[in-house]
């Protein structure tokens, strides 16, 4: 609870319990636990989550709150029987998320200011844009989509513009101040399209749909943008801004309609931050700086993860700040693909990530690699970590 762990995985076999901890997106093996103590621990977790401790085969989900001093986290638990025993995954989520804005995630002003233009923030130069389709994305499996989604919506003027979100029953992705949530599904007995049609009567300024996958919902949003000058913000899992746009294009709505409503696509990947206490400077080779596009006159040194002297291994205690990992926390790497005539034409004729990315870079988009190189030059991350994050 006191560290940066986001998930813990338990694999129960007949004799023991294997455990893994995810810290800053990387899985670490933990000491093996004997089955007897593991069973007692699991019974406590299931009881706290209001699950059946005796049931070891049927899938169960629940959550509980854990508190350690001033740290309070919501623990979402999922258990499922396996041929050899049981697998249990617990996800940790801070009750009060310290990351409230895109700036908190590491989004630089050049990208943030452009994104704010599309999401309805007043501009000193040019008209304020209050219509269009905005896509927010991040990789799947812990890539940060929920976090960047909330932070992206927080960039909007939610006091001047009225937003309403649509989510399946049981989902609460859009927990953002001043955005009301309308649920639909079997539990509520409501269907998505009638729910949207009813919300339209309120005449909101914008619609919000996380992890969109239903072509009918996307079609309804596009129609609202075209006929009523509304704004729509959706999210998908994707590795790049261009891939996110291609995924939305592949949902089945006519390409001409997507081309007419599309505004921008914001994508984030997460890179681990070097520990500020133990990171080590080194002199980069001039050829490396040239490959990175960094002027040698401005960048004299880069930083890397702490490399202990082999002769001192085991003698020096690990860094108290990062517990010897060399990294502490994560930072977002961003890219923003903005609409232009070439992008519109590509949506209609060649809706694929490679084409979108090529056009965007030719039009001046700051690519995720370029954003990462800035973080590298500032000593925020390492060359090896940047390569891993962009792979």
Where are these regions (language model features)?
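Short, flexible helix-loop junctions that flank or precede catalytic/ligand sites
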Residues: 1-391
